[in-house]
């Protein structure tokens, strides 16, 4: 699945493929897994996620990546490894691509997400339930892009991250209010959004 983003003002030095990890065991179980204690070594790809990636690389229709950078959570690491292996690339970890931390909602049902998103729409700096604010997520993901822009030229960089962080990044890059990040169409597992 592919998504599109209006080209922001200015020109990019590189092309980016923003990828949400494949369907995970956390998705399968309907759980919020956002803390490194749980996400680094557990809740990797589900059988559906493995199948999604197999189909994705077999029918790849985006520019061929030259670098693969990913969150260090197991589900993103496995996703990145599968794509990188297909193209004969190594992977690179950047912890700034990690899942948004959902605080006290960790290991709770994912039916709690809408309550957080409703608060996000009122105040992108809120930290209710101990969640990481939308503003903080936007800052760290934009810093990844800024650093890559300074470091590389004419690269095609696959960034493998998580649903909320990528939604927030896309909202920020489009110049929209961060409070509107859930107004964007939801990024589905194993989807890719080209940028630049």
Where do the language-model regions lie?
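Domain-level recognition of soluble alpha/beta enzyme cores
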Residues: 176-196
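Short active-site segment of divalent metal-dependent hydrolases/proteases
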Residues: 24, 165-166
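Short beta-strand scaffold positions
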Residues: 70-71, 139, 160-161
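Phosphate-handling substructures
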Residues: 39, 44, 85-142
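Glycine-rich phosphate-binding loop signature in dinucleotide/nucleotide-binding domains
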Residues: 61-64, 148-155
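Generic beta-sheet signal
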Residues: 16, 153-163
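Short aromatic-enriched loop/helix-cap "lid" or pocket-rim segments at secondary-structure transitions
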Residues: 28-32, 103-107, 171-172
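Active-site-proximal alpha-helix that buttresses catalytic centers in soluble enzyme cores
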Residues: 2-15, 19, 23-87
């Amino acid at each position: 699945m592919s998504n599109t983003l209006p080209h922001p003002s200015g020109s990019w030095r590189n092309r980016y493929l923003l990828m949400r990890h494949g369907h995970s065991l956390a998705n399968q179980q309907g759980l919020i897994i956002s803390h490194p204690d749980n996400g680094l070594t557990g809740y990797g790809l589900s059988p559906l996620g493995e199948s999604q990636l197999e189909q994705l690389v077999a029918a790849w229709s985006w520019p061929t990546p030259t670098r693969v950078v990913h969150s260090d959570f197991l589900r993103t690491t496995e996703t990145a490894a599968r794509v990188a292996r297909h193209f004969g690339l190594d992977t690179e970890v950047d912890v700034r691509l990690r899942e948004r931390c959902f605080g006290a909602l960790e290991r709770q049902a994912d039916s709690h997400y809408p309550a957080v998103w409703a608060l996000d729409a009122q105040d992108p700096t809120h930290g209710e339930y101990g969640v990481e604010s939308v503003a903080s997520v936007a800052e760290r993901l934009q810093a990844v892009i800024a650093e890559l822009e300074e470091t590389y030229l004419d690269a095609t960089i696959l960034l493998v991250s998580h649903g909320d962080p990528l939604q927030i990044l896309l909202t920020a890059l489009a110049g929209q209010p961060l409070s509107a990040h859930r107004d964007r169409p939801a990024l589905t597992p194993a989807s890719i959004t080209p940028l630049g």
